[in-house]
Amino acid sequence: MEKKKEVRALAKYVKMSAHKVRRVINQIRGRSYEEALISLEFLPYRACYPLLQLVSSAAANANNNLGLKKDTLLISEAKVDEASVSKRFQPRAQGRAYSIQKDTCHITIKIRERSK
């Protein structure tokens, strides 16, 4: 039994909530590399830009490290995990302060060769 070749790319501490990235990543999971690029270019979400960079990086890793062609690649796994939260304070009226949480996330993309 031949082991499937798989490469991954990670983006850590992306300054965006995991909930917003999951909305986009659910639409590219299981798609081919070209379909994912087209989807990410035309979706109107801010999360598309770091995902586009990450998918391109994973494809470059597959091409350079394993010699796989980009037209045969498939996104086999795509996940988002919550990372640390930075806490800030917003000054308000009468000496009060509201806390603001700045969320970050870790994004993992795994790409493998499409089975024929």
UniProtKB/Swiss-Prot annotation:
Domain of life: Eukaryota
Subunit organization: Part of the 50S ribosomal subunit.
Entry-linked HAMAP family: Ribosomal_uL22_B
Protein family membership: Belongs to the universal ribosomal protein uL22 family.
NCBIfam families assigned to the protein according to its UniProt record, in alphabetical order: rplV_bact
CDD domains assigned to the protein according to its UniProt record, in alphabetical order: Ribosomal_L22
Keywords: Chloroplast, Plastid, Ribonucleoprotein, Ribosomal protein, RNA-binding, rRNA-binding
Example of a GO cellular component annotation carried by this entry: large ribosomal subunit
UniProt-listed PROSITE patterns: RIBOSOMAL_L22
Full protein name: Large ribosomal subunit protein uL22c
Record's signal peptide: none
Gene Ontology terms for molecular function: rRNA binding; structural constituent of ribosome
SUPFAM superfamilies noted in UniProt: Ribosomal protein L22
Gene Ontology process terms (BP): translation
Localization per record: Plastid, Chloroplast
